[in-house]
Amino acid sequence: QPKQFINFGNWTLFGKTLERIKNSIFDYPIVSTNKKYISEIKKHLKLKGFKKYRIILEPAKRNTAPAILSSTLIKEIPENQPLIFLTSDHLIEKTNLFNKSIKQHQKYLTDKNIFIFGIKPSNPSSEFGYFLSKRVNNKYKVSKFIEKPNLEKAKKIVKKNAYWNSGMFFLTKKSIINNFKKHQNRIFNHCLNSVNKSKFKNNIYNLNKNNFLKCKTISFDYAILEKSKDINAINLNIPWSDLGSWK
């Protein structure tokens, strides 16, 4: 069973993620997954009181770039809509600070830029990727990404005020479209065709298999973040655990 659905007494990681968006600043959740977990996801959504939601069913694993793009391209989302992408296996405390930071940064969103959430390291760790950022005009501009370093390098970059890359993103639909068209146009076309030919029923989009399978398997970090010149950071000092890295 995936970690996000394991019951820790009376809670699960996916349940905690849904609780995080039970706030008036958010609209409705869109969950990207595959057929295997659909009943578990619907059970959680019902339990947390979500009447409106969308589930995007991927016919195959293609990593986070196609998953993010295909869940964005559904027609009901307006192009200027701000979107926040959350992983389902993270544990975040002080959600009031997390939500406050989203509200504070929304005014800076454009049709090209991307905000990533950085977490102040509680200790040097080789389990996570890092980034360096510098303050430019009221926001933090990402200057460098560092792949999961060894422990010695992690100690050095933490002293340079590096933040953990949490894998959570905040941007507009238009920005996603523009970035994929510019940096990953083939993935964009295959995902668009897959969404346009999808079947929609009972809150669920079944993506078109033939088109989706043509998408390259690649993470959003490699596909877009490493190529875009307009990456900004929302740097947070809150308790955070990526239990996806828990063995």
PLM regions with names:
Residues F5, I55-I56, I114-I116, I231-A233:
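Conserved beta-strand scaffold positions in the cores of enzyme catalytic domains, especially
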Residues Y130-K247:
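Catalytic core of tubulin tyrosine ligase-like
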Residues N7, W11-F85, L91-N96, I119:
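Conserved N-terminal catalytic core of the sugar/cofactor nucleotidyltransferase
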Residues K61-A65, S122-S125, L151-E152, W240-D242:
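A short acidic, often aromatic-flanked loop/helix-cap motif at beta-alpha or helix-coil junctions
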Residues L91-S125:
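Conserved donor-nucleotide/metal-binding helix-loop-beta segment in metal-dependent transferases, i.e.
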Residues Q1:
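N-terminal nucleotide-binding beta1-loop-alpha1 segment
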Residues F5, F14, S71, D89, ...:
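Residue-level signal for inorganic ion chemistry
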Residues K43, T95-F98, S126-Y130, K181:
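Short acidic, glycine/serine/threonine-rich loops at helix termini
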